[in-house]
Amino acid sequence: MGPPSGKTYMGWWGHMGGPKQKGITSYAVSPYAQKPLQGIFHNAVFNSFRRFKSQFLYVLIPAGIYWYWWKNGNEYNEFLYSKAGREELERVNV
């Protein structure tokens, strides 16, 4: 029996014309189907830590740069509007 072509009829679903199956003696349910939620809390903790560990630099470095820029800007603004910084404020605003 060759590969199916337009002129070859293999049969309907379940009756494909092949040899009968033999030797199936038992049926089992997959262990994944029996315990679908096994280990979710353990895996959630360690997977969350792994994800955090691999991503925290992508957040921490830009946040640190922004915080440094914001802190220096506030200090400079407080200096400009103090008694000691009035002269520089007049020079900057020209």
From Swiss-Prot:
- Which BP terms in the Gene Ontology apply to this protein? aerobic respiration; cellular respiration; mitochondrial electron transport, ubiquinol to cytochrome c
Tell me the compartments it is located in.
Mitochondrion inner membrane
Q: How does it sit in the membrane?
A: Single-pass membrane protein
Is Mitochondrion among this UniProt entry's keywords?
A: yes
According to the record, the segments passing through the membrane are 50-80
Mitochondrial matrix topological domain? 2-49
GO-annotated cellular components: mitochondrial inner membrane; mitochondrion; respiratory chain complex III
Tell whether Electron transport is among the UniProt keywords: yes
Q: What molecular functions are annotated in GO for this chain?
A: ubiquinol-cytochrome-c reductase activity
Top-level division of the source organism's lineage: Eukaryota
Under the heading InterPro entries, the entry gives:
Cyt_bc1_su8 (IPR004205), Cyt_bc1_su8_sf (IPR036642)
- List keywords of the entry alphabetically: Electron transport, Membrane, Mitochondrion, Mitochondrion inner membrane, Respiratory chain, Transmembrane, Transmembrane helix, Transport
SUPFAM superfamilies documented for this protein: Ubiquinone-binding protein QP-C of cytochrome bc1 complex (Ubiquinol-cytochrome c reductase) (SSF81508)
Add the further remark from the entry. Answer: Present with 6140 molecules/cell in log phase SD medium.
Q: Its biological function?
A: Component of the ubiquinol-cytochrome c oxidoreductase, a multisubunit transmembrane complex that is part of the mitochondrial electron transport chain which drives oxidative phosphorylation.
Family, according to the entry, reads as follows:
Belongs to the UQCRQ/QCR8 family.
Q: How does it assemble?
A: Component of the ubiquinol-cytochrome c oxidoreductase (cytochrome b-c1 complex, complex III, CIII), a multisubunit enzyme composed of 10 subunits. The complex is composed of 3 respiratory subunits cytochrome b (COB), cytochrome c1 (CYT1) and Rieske protein (RIP1), 2 core protein subunits COR1 and QCR2, and 5 low-molecular weight protein subunits QCR6, QCR7, QCR8, QCR9 and QCR10.
> What is the official name of this protein in its record?
Cytochrome b-c1 complex subunit 8, mitochondrial
Q: Which gene encodes it?
A: QCR8
